[in-house]
């Protein structure tokens, strides 16, 4: 017997969203009542742009550190295969607005304050593809995204 599965992100109409934005995908509860929230952190417009792998990889490593410095409860921040943004998985209840503020602040630091020495996990021992990083691209993308503004609504521009 095959279990019917609906993957929410494949049900989203990618032609009507307006990136950059943060969107709450789902809230789920574990067997003991623990809440996990899953966010769509969309940095570039789907099917119109994508962040090249090395820049996205560096943003990923930086967000792993910067988000945790700004908010408690981060489980993981993983890039979408389409390279337009990230899934952000959090313990507890968080609003799209709060997450958008954290992402904005993190990207501002990437754009203006980060040096190569600040990028975590860039050695053979600490990264599975340590040669595939590009801080220049990460900084350029971060600034482009900040300049557009990050919305807490995926369908209308409500920039925070």
UniProtKB/Swiss-Prot annotation:
Residues reported in the UniProt entry to bind Fe cation: 57, 61, 127
Iron as UniProt keyword: yes
Keyword hit for Phosphoprotein: no
GO molecular function: iron ion binding; S-ribosylhomocysteine lyase activity
A biological-process GO annotation: quorum sensing
Record's function text: Involved in the synthesis of autoinducer 2 (AI-2) which is secreted by bacteria and is used to communicate both the cell density and the metabolic potential of the environment. The regulation of gene expression in response to changes in cell density is called quorum sensing. Catalyzes the transformation of S-ribosylhomocysteine (RHC) to homocysteine (HC) and 4,5-dihydroxy-2,3-pentadione (DPD).
Official protein name in the record: S-ribosylhomocysteine lyase
